[in-house]
Structure formats: structure tokens, C-alpha cells
Amino acid sequence: QVIQSLENNEVDFSLVSIMPTTLRVDHMDLLQNKLFLVGNMEREFKHGPYGKSLLSQLPLIFREKGSGTRQVMESFLKKQNVPVIRKLELTSNEAVKQAVRAGLGYSIMPLIGLRNELLNKQLQIIPMKGLPIKTTWRLIWLSGKKHSPVAKAFLSYLKKERARIIENTFRWFEEYE
């Protein structure tokens, strides 16, 4: 859906963790993306890191087909070569997060959207061998696109201020490896 909006020229930019293969795009690397196995606080996971057998015991919640998060999660699960319990498929990271909070299952999710829930002890990171998965958040746009003055100013601002924004806003990322 994100890529389709870009392709249809409905948006100037898209934020992705996996580069599209069907479009010619330019990009700017923004921030490391770390994906962890997360669950609510009902069950304790103190004796990790856990091996792949844990994955076959947990009901898993997936993003929709085409989602970068889903692609990364499925690739990881395929490498683990264990059967999994597919509980739900939802259309946004926020929906997945709320389902996990409600105790409907577990998921492999990007750290970027979990800060408040981790601080408030509504979610926990489950230590797992092979995690976190690390990718890169990238801002992409169609190659050769003629940007509006506002879009040009936005790109210029990001190029100039990227390091400062990361330092001031995402320093907490470093706590999680």
C-alpha cells in the first residue's frame, strides 16, 4: 500500500525498511530498524535467550502481506525451520501492538513503535537467539521526481539535521540490542 501510493504519485515520500524491487527510487538512509519478539506481561521470559523451539509454542500475530515487517518476520521464521501458530493478520504495526498488549499473541515488531509500552511495562521484549533483526529505515521517492518547494525543503532539512534528530529523539534505541 505504501509503495502503491508512491507509484501512483499520491505521496512525495514513503518510509520503508525493505527497498521496493518494482520501482526506480532514490533514497535516504534514516535510522537503524531493530525488530524484536514481543509479548505482553502475562508470562515471564527470564531465562533467555530462547531458542527456536519457543516460536512453535507461541501464537503469532502477523502484519498483512506486502508489509516490510511481515517480510522480515517470515524470512526469520523460515530460517528457524519450525512450525508456527498463525493466530492473526493485521494491517498496521499499531494494530499488532494492541493485539499483543491484549494478550492475543506475540509478534516480531520494530522497536521504533514500542518505546512507551516498554517503559510502561505493557509489553516486554522476549530474548531470542537471532534477534534483533536489523534493517534500515529509508525515506524513498520516485527517481527523477520533480519535488515541490516544500518537499525539497523537507529533504534538505533531513539531510542537514538527520544526525541531530536521531541523537535527540532516538538515543533510547541504544539500550536495546
Give a label for each model feature.
Residues 1-3, 89-96:
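Short helix-initiation/N-cap motifs at beta->coil->alpha
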Residues 1-35, 39, 46-49, 101-104, ...:
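Short beta-strand-centered segments that line the small-molecule binding cleft or hinge
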Residues 4-5, 29, 53-54, 76, ...:
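Well-formed, non-transmembrane alpha-helical positions, independent of function
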Residues 17-18, 83-92:
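Short beta-strand-to-loop elements that line the ligand-binding cleft
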Residues 18-19, 41, 111-113, 129-130, ...:
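Short secondary-structure boundary segments
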Residues 26-65, 134-146, 158-163:
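Hydrophobic/proline-rich hinge and linker segments of small-molecule sensing/allosteric domains
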Residues 45-46, 59-80, 147-151, 155-156, ...:
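Secondary-structure junction motif
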Residues 62-64, 86, 109:
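Thr-Gly-centered strand-to-loop micro-motif
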